[in-house]
Amino acid sequence: MARFKRILLKLSGESLMGEKQYGIAEKRLGEYAQQIKEIHEMGVQIGIVIGGGNIFRGLSGASKGFDRVKGDQMGMLATVINSLGLSSALGAASVKTRVLTAVRMEPIGEFYSKWKAIEAMENGEVVIMSAGTGNPFFTTDTGSSLRGIEIEADVMLKGTRVDGIYTADPEKDPTATKFDDITYDEVLSRGLKVMDLTATCMCKENKLPIIVFDMDTVGNLKKVMSGENIGTLVHP
């Protein structure tokens, strides 16, 4: 029995690189597809948002002289590339998908609407929502928060390369300790970088809980959905 009926799964674009320095690692993409297939077979309705940091990140582009709006638009297109890649991998695993885009680009994907996304999920399709919010100056964390709220998800699952939220960056501080659960207020007061401020406040105001977990360890997604105590729960 799945712990949640409908989820928004946020995936890191950078995680798609696997051991590579750029682009998409086919092995990692295949592992993600298999993990998603496992929970799809549990009857979970799945919406997905993927970042684009493995290809282009608008904010870093701006620091190198790109116009910020153009840079963010390039980042949006990077998320579409990743979404098509995941859609293809899921299709190869016999999972039906639908790619929706926040800006019109048929026939690459259908133009996003809340109702289209919900109808597709209720019909058993995995819905991959790409191109962020369609607007510059918004991160894919904010895009995933918005989509999670819109599709009335029970939870946002934020798949990362670390196994939860820590008091400090565990890759830099060996004394950092992990939270099993934490409130939004504490995340904000401690200045913990779970997501950007806009995304965190949106989830807090709309009472959308988040579970931050290590998606790169195969089998973890199913463990989260089965109710195992892994990752960190962020709640109102």
Regions found by a protein language model. Name each.
Residues M1-P236:
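C-terminal catalytic "cap/lid" subdomain
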